[in-house]
Amino acid sequence: MKIFQELIDSGSIKEEKIDFVLMKKVLAKSRRSIRSSKLILNDGDSEGSYELAYEAMLLAGRALVFSFNYRPRATGSHKIVADFVKKVLNDNEDVKLAFKFDKMRKNRHYLIYGAGLAISEIEAKNAISSANSLLEKIEIIIEEKNPQKKLEI
């Protein structure tokens, strides 16, 4: 597709047919990460909760990439997925969600490799909410593309 040409030309994504069964499994794992994020937050671990909420967004984003019959290359895959999501989600509210995902990617990177960043309970709750919204949006997009979806009679 033309909107992905830059990612294709740079070698960031490659064409690969991926079935809907795998996409459903990745989406289910994303949903589990959101549930785990809530549990960890209730236990007082805001940073762990934030990281799991980000993981849920990453998994949902990967499923979205798969739904267009692409796979991100391994090196830099988190950024590639975030960039791909930005290209697909293009209405006003969805763009905000895609940018939240990218901001969370950068924060999570700093949590893992940097020092001094603390995540508050409010930030973790917002991350969970954003992860849930992104997952729901991506589930709708993927379901619309599913050739096996139920016929409405």
Kindly give the residue locations of the regions a language model identified.
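Terminal alpha-helical segments
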Residues: 1-153
